[in-house]
Amino acid sequence: MCRVFMIAGTHSGAGKTTLSLGIMGVLSKKYNVRPFKVGPDYIDTAYHRYVTRNFSVNLDLFMLGEENLKNLFYKNASRADVSIIEGVMGLYDGIDTTSRGSSAHIAKLVNVPVVLVVDASSMAASVSALIMGYIYYDKDVDIRGVILNKVGSERHYTLLKEVIERDLNIEVFGYLPKDVELELPERHLGLLPVYETENLDKKLEKLYGYIENCIDVEKLMNLTVKPPDFIEKEDRVLKEKKVKIAYAYDEAFNFYYKESLETLEEMGAHLIPFSPLDDERLPEGTEGLYIGGGFPEVFAKRLSENESMLREIKEAVEKGMPVYAECGGLMYLSKGIRDLEGNRYSMVGVYDFEVVMTKKLQRFGYVEAEITMDNVLFKKGERIKGHEFHYSRIEGFSQNASYIVNRPGKEEKWECGFVHKNCLASFVHINLYTYKEGVKRFLDRCSSFGRK
C-alpha cells in the first residue's frame, strides 16, 4: 500500500500551499516525503523541494497526457514513505469551464484520497453546507476529510468540528489559526521565489509548530491506496561518453521540471549547473546549453554586468553550439531587457529583438504549437503542448520563428520558437519527458558539436 493523499482547496487562497508546506515539512522530519503539484507551476514546487529536500513532480494533464502522468506519479510515489500532492486552484477548477485537469480529475486518475482545505473565517454552521457541496458535486472524488484554515480561536474550532461531525460523515484532521505571519509574499507570477523570501525559515518553524499542535498528522499517514502494478520503462541510454550539457541554475534561472532534467540524463546527458549571474565562463567541455525560465528581469542589472558570461554564450552560439532556452532564457538571449521604469540592460544579443516588461499580463495559460521549420528539438510538422505565463513582450525584428502558437480552441495565433544557427528560444514552457525524440535530436547535435 502507498501512503498518499492530496491537499486541495475550496478555492485559490484557501490556504492549501501553506498547509501543504507545513505538513510536508513536519512529516519530512521522520519520513521520506515525495511532493507533487497539480499543474505546471514552478514556484510552489521549489518550496516543496526546500521543505522536503526532494524534487517535486508536476502532474499536468494537458502537457503529459494520462498515461505519462500516471507513470510519473506511481514511479515516484513507490520510492517514498509518503507522497503528498498539492492541488491547484479550487478542487474542481480545470481547463476553461470544465473540471478536466483539475485537482479532482487528477485525484480520480491516480486514485488518491483528498483532504479539503476550507477557509473557515467568519463561519459557523454554514461550513457544513460548503463542505457538503464539494462532497456531492462529484461523488467519485474520495474526500476523506478536511482541514480548517484561518480559524479564530480554539473555541471557534471546537464549534466548527462539532457541526461538521454532526452533519457529515467525514474526518476533521485539525486547523490553522489566523496568523498573518504565516502568509508567503507574492509577486506577478505568484509566490515570491524561495531565493527571495525573507525570514523563510522563521516562518516555516512557526508554521511547523502550528501543524504539530493543531493537526493530527499521524491520522493523515493512515490515508493509503493500493497502487496498480507498475513496471518502470527503461529509457536510459548507456553511452561510454556522456554529452556535457550546461544548464543555467541560480536565483535568476531555476524553472525546470524534474522530469525534464531526468529525461536529459536518461538519454545520455551529463548535466552541469552554471550561474549566468556569478560564473565568468561556461563549464569546461560544454557541448550544449539549456537555459530555463525564471526572473531575469529582477536580476537584469547583475546579468548585464557579467559581460564575460554574455560574451562566452554569444561566441558559443555563433560557433554552432546547440542551445535550448525557455521564457526567461529567451529574455537572456535577446539584445536587452527594458524594465517598467524604462531602464535598459544589455543581454547576450543572440537575437535582434529586445524584451520589454509590461504591467499587463501578456500571455497566460496552456498553448499548442505547430512546428513550421526544423530546429534543434523538433521537426517541421510536429505539434507540441506547453504553457506561457509572462509580463513581457518582444520589440523589434523576430527572426526565424519556428512555432505557430495558439490557445486550444481559440482562433488567435502568434509566432514564437526563434531560431539562430543551433539556438532555439521560446516563451513556451514544455516538459521534455513527453518529447524524448526531440531530446535525442538535441543531444545528437550537441555530441556532433563536441566532436568538432
From Swiss-Prot:
Keyword flag Magnesium: yes
Class of enzymatic activity (EC top level): ligase
Catalytic activity: cob(II)yrinate + 2 L-glutamine + 2 ATP + 2 H2O = cob(II)yrinate a,c diamide + 2 L-glutamate + 2 ADP + 2 phosphate + 2 H(+)
Pfam family membership, one: CbiA
InterPro entries associated with the record: CbiA/CobB_synth (IPR004484), Class_I_gatase-like (IPR029062), CobQ/CobB/MinD/ParA_Nub-bd_dom (IPR002586), GATase_3 (IPR011698), P-loop_NTPase (IPR027417)
Coiled-coil annotated residue ranges, if any: none
Site residues (Increases nucleophilicity of active site Cys), renumbered to this chain: H429
Signal sequence annotation: none
GO MF annotations, alphabetized: ATP binding; cobyrinic acid a,c-diamide synthase activity
PROSITE patterns: GATASE_COBBQ (PS51274)
GO BP terms, alphabetized: cobalamin biosynthetic process
Residue positions of the active site: C327
Keyword Magnesium in record: yes
Cofactor entry: Mg(2+)
Domains as described in the record: Comprises of two domains. The C-terminal domain contains the binding site for glutamine and catalyzes the hydrolysis of this substrate to glutamate and ammonia. The N-terminal domain is anticipated to bind ATP and cobyrinate and catalyzes the ultimate synthesis of the diamide product. The ammonia produced via the glutaminase domain is probably translocated to the adjacent domain via a molecular tunnel, where it reacts with an activated intermediate.
Remaining remarks: The a and c carboxylates of cobyrinate are activated for nucleophilic attack via formation of a phosphorylated intermediate by ATP. CbiA catalyzes first the amidation of the c-carboxylate, and then that of the a-carboxylate.
Function: Catalyzes the ATP-dependent amidation of the two carboxylate groups at positions a and c of cobyrinate, using either L-glutamine or ammonia as the nitrogen source.
Family: Belongs to the CobB/CbiA family.
UniProt name for this protein: Cobyrinate a,c-diamide synthase
